[in-house]
Amino acid sequence: MKKILTIILLFLSTSILSANERDAQLDKLFNELKKNTSSSSSSIAQQIWTLWSTHPTDQKLTSILDEGSRLVQDQKLYKAIEVFTKAIELDPSWAEAWNKRATVLYMIGKYKESQNDIDKVLNLEQRHFGALAGQGLVNIKLKNYEKAIE
């Protein structure tokens, strides 16, 4: 029993370290993004998207998010919402799951629900430029033009 607890604690500490390393990587990339020219900015932004879209500790959740993204590409939007909701239920602290669902909600015209999810994203990751852009689009659709400019 003691050996099993040791293994579990070792696994959990490795997962926590991975999440901390991921946060450090994001901080580094955002600092680079601030300093770089537009020619290298898209490469840095893509690296950030990759980190956001990869769950820090659970490959199964990454696979669920990928499945939802495939459903969006296939225009199966309501099914995609179900899949993204499942990812949110499994880890409500994963900003990208909220962001993906917010995007699909926007696509089907559920702007207030999309804004609610965007608020969650920005509470979890205030630098999420995808959510910030989405927030502007939602505010335009809701005719909140002053907020859209912010």
Question: What is the predicted role of each segment?
Answer:
Residues 54, 73, 107-108, 141-142:
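Register position in tetratricopeptide repeats
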